[in-house]
Amino acid sequence: MKKAIIGRKIGMTQIFDENGKVIPVTVVEAGPCAVLQKKTEEKDGYNAIQVGFEDIREKLANKPKKGHFAKAGVSLKRIVREFRLENIDEYEVGTEIKADVFAAGDKVDVTGVSKGKGFQGTIKRWNFHRGPMAHGSKYHRAVGSMGAASDPSRTFKNKKMPGHMGNKKSTILNIEVVKVMADKNVLLIKGGIPGPNKGYVVIKDTVKA
């Protein structure tokens, strides 16, 4: 059974396994997510479910959104995502998906928006080496050569240069769910995941399985 859920990153901590080894984990509040809509291959051309996460006040939703949520019989949600699944018959509109759909040992892919770093140079953005910091050096943190001179007389596309860093969609593949705290709808996921604390993430079964 393919599984997916929307969650929110709480932060990082560490736990100990049965051998006393320290495991760094990210704490994620996963669900509950309400099923808003089912899409079928006959009607829509593909199979998918649409889910919503985190309740919001009524004034924050416009009339079409209110109608969409009312049709599903669920409260207004802040985040809405669609997951392409083949086993949509196992889901019903109006029901909830909770953290216990996953189990300890599952391998998942986690997608979020990375932390924005603003405009950064090539040393921070692309791990370039810097020049000598000696008094006589005139080259410290500059980009250096950007290409040849008369031929081809231009800078190639996708050249690594200074620019906006972070604040992009990012996915970490094939990481392990260490522990599921079903009573609190919390997942402990091994290692770090994209985004800041309180950032929204999507957790799916890994594509590498």
Curated annotation (Swiss-Prot):
InterPro entries to which the protein is assigned, alphabetical: Ribosomal_uL3, Ribosomal_uL3_bac/org-type, Ribosomal_uL3_CS, Transl_B-barrel_sf
GO molecular function: rRNA binding; structural constituent of ribosome
Keywords: Ribonucleoprotein, Ribosomal protein, RNA-binding, rRNA-binding
GO BP term, pick one: translation
CC annotations in GO: cytosolic large ribosomal subunit
SUPFAM superfamilies: Translation proteins
Keyword Iron tagged: no
KW Ribonucleoprotein (keyword) present: yes
Annotated S-S bridges: none
Annotated Gene3D superfamilies: 3.30.160.810, Translation factors
Function: One of the primary rRNA binding proteins, it binds directly near the 3'-end of the 23S rRNA, where it nucleates assembly of the 50S subunit.
Sequence similarity: Belongs to the universal ribosomal protein uL3 family.
Subunit-structure text: Part of the 50S ribosomal subunit. Forms a cluster with proteins L14 and L19.
Entry-linked NCBIfam families: L3_bact (TIGR03625)
The name this protein goes by in its record: Large ribosomal subunit protein uL3
Organism: Clostridium novyi (strain NT)
